[in-house]
Amino acid sequence: MLKKVLIKGPVLSRSGYGEQARFALRALQSRPDLFDIYIVNIPWGRTGQISSVDEEANVIHETLLKTQTYVHQKGQFDISLQVTVPNEFEKIAPINIGYTAAIETTKVSPQWIAKANETVDRIIVVSDHSKKVFEQTKYDVKDQNGNEHKNWGLQVPVETVNYPVRVFEPEEVNIDFRTSKNFRHRRS
């Protein structure tokens, strides 16, 4: 039986997170024998939207419509893959995976750790540095009852999935540098 996977992220955005969401979409689409894919597009700041009219854009728009129909019929998802920052993670399905670029600094905010611990079963990051920072960030905290907890940190596994880079072949450009108009030395 196919797993119903919801990708929630800025799939239509011209941004790094948009590229990340489309990368995840392509990866899941490569296994139609395993996954029935649904999409919820979220806004991403003031970034523009993809404007290409190609096969991928058509599939995204068709999947968005399929998702609206499925949600309207009260359909449930088996897995959610949430491509966003950790403070926006939610419990959507029985299995929830946060997929984030995270941060390139030395410590994760306690709010991100708390939200991840409460809502997702696993986190995927795009760099080994982010993984290390998530795993090594610890805080001394007090719970609602006043009990102190030392070295409190992330309680869910973190995996690194590196970002693919498109390889472009440069086009040959024929330029005639012989000219009498450009780069001419003028006398005063």
Predicted regions and their residues:
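N-terminal subdomain of nucleotide-sugar transferases
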Residues: 1-45
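Residues at the starts of beta-strands that form the adenosine-phosphate
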Residues: 4, 34-36, 95, 122, ...
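Residues that mark the start of a beta-strand
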Residues: 4, 187-188
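Extended catalytic core of nucleotide-activated donor transferases of GT-like folds
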Residues: 6-8, 46-133
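Short secondary-structure boundary/capping segments
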Residues: 22-24, 54-56, 97-98, 138-143, ...
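Structural signal for conserved beta-strand scaffold positions within catalytic alpha/beta enzyme cores
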Residues: 39, 82, 98, 159-162
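Helix-enriched interaction subdomains in cytosolic or periplasmic regions
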Residues: 39-56, 148-152
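Donor nucleotide-sugar binding/catalytic pocket of nucleotide-sugar-dependent glycosyltransferases
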Residues: 121-186
